[in-house]
Each structure stands twice: as structure tokens, then as C-alpha cells.
Amino acid sequence: MNEITLMSFGYVFGAPEGADTVIGTRGLPNPYWVEELKHKTGLNQAVRDYVFSTPEAEAYYESCLDMLRRRIAFYERYDSPLKTPLRIGIGCTGGKHRSVSMTVRLAAALEGEGIPIRVLHRDLDKTLEHSAGAVVFTREAGEPRFVILSSVFGNPGFPKGHIEAGESDRDTALRETEEETGLRVRLLPGFRAVNVFPLPNKPNTWKQVIYYLGEYENQPLRPRAGEIAEARLLPYEAALSALRFENTRSVLREAKTFLDELPAASARSGGH
């Protein structure tokens, strides 16, 4: 029998190269949002129990197992001098909880049926920090003006912060925007941008920031003292030039494209 590998991975770190089949697990219950489980991994039984705690999750596992049985049977029947090892990627957001749980359980079931499995957990040693924020704008003479904040450390960007226990990412975006700018914004439906980048001062640590698009009217900017050195309201091109990092510029470009394609009446009708 040729080598068969099941590899867990995190989508934020990229899909695994050379995977013949990829199984997604992002629809399963996520232990990250359970305080006593978030710092554990899918190698822990309590985490696996949580991931497969619903009838839908159990049914999805069974369908994945059945699919792999058929995929492996087809692979074993295939005869060619160019035949390569079979690689199955199993992904979730960060590669620590759901994908690892599914990989462990599928591998155990297949090995119990006499199928040797090589198991790899590609991103288990990586840490993913979760934050959320908003690209905040108002309209002047029909054109958007964007709020650009400069922290006391000098890095210009958008209001954002860590997602607290019990918060949704939208809740965090609203809270952080009000705390850092003094603005109560309306999140426009349909926009969600994700920014992922490594933290240079933390080995094997990445940050994922989910951005929404927040609109406000007739409110003064009140930047948070001691944290925000400057808050500017800029037209698009000036805002783009003010941002130093390409991943942040990319979020602003997405927001501007979204606004350009959105009728003004629809933008004004958005809600929390």
C-alpha cells in the first residue's frame, strides 16, 4: 500500500501544497470561543468532544469518512509508474482545533480498518490572535472620507482590537471604534475583509483582523487619549497614501470598491 497522509492545516496560513483532496471543517463547532478549550488543541479529547457535539457535526464526520474510504479505494486501484503518495488536507481557520480533531478521528477510524495513515499537523505550533475593527467613513459632498488613526507608536491604520470573551467580531468592531474614535457607527451589510499577518516580535504568532465598514454622520472625532496620537479624516487617495502597510491598503481598496458599487440609498439604510 502506498503512503497516505492526512494533514491538518489552517486556511489563514495557506492551503497545503500538493494536496490531492481538501476537507473543510470551518462549519463545525469552534472550541476557540470556549474559554476552557481555546488554549488546547484537537489532540485533546475534550476539544474533539466539543467539535463533534452536534448531530450535524457527527453526520459531516461520517460523510467525510465515507468519502475517504472511496477515495482511498480508488487510489489503491490506480496503477501507474508515476503514482505519488496520496495527500489529504483537512483545514480550519487556524489549524489547531477543528481540523486537528477531524484529522485525529478520521485517521483512527481508517487505521482501525487496516489502512496505514501518516498524520501531520502543519500549523499546530502556530498561534493565531483574533482581532476585529472597522474601516470608518463619512460622506462629504457625496464622497467618502475615511478615518485614519495614528497610534502613539506611529503606525497609521483603522480602529481595531482584540475580540473579548463572549463578543462577536461585529461587537468588537463597534466597541473598538467607539473607544478609539468616540464615534458610534453603523456597520454596512455585505462587507467583511480579513487581514492576516505575522507578528515580528512573537515567533510563530500571526494576527487575524476582521474588518467591517462603518459609516457615521454629524459626529466629532474624539481620539482616545494616551493611545491614539492623531485621528484624520481623509479622502480616499490621501488615506491610501497615509497607510504604510500593503495589507492595510488592500483593506481600504476593498472598502472603496464596495462603496463605489453600492447605491447611496443602500449605504444609508445599513444597520448594526
Task: Label each residue range with its predicted role.
Residues 1-86, 113, 123-125:
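C-terminal accessory "lid"/substrate-recognition subdomains
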Residues 81-108:
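Catalytic cysteine-centered active loop of the rhodanese-like fold, especially the PTP/DSP P-loop
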Residues 87-92, 120, 148-149:
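Extended hydrophobic secondary-structure segments that form protein cores and membrane-embedded regions
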Residues 107-116:
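Post-Walker A helix-loop "phosphate-sensing" segment adjacent to the P-loop in P-loop NTPases
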Residues 116-118, 132, 185:
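Hydrophobic anchor at the start of a short beta-strand
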Residues 119-124, 241-272:
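Charged phosphate-binding loop/patch that engages nucleotide di/tri-phosphates or the phosphate backbone
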Residues 127-159:
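N-terminal strand-loop-strand
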Residues 161-253:
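Unchanged
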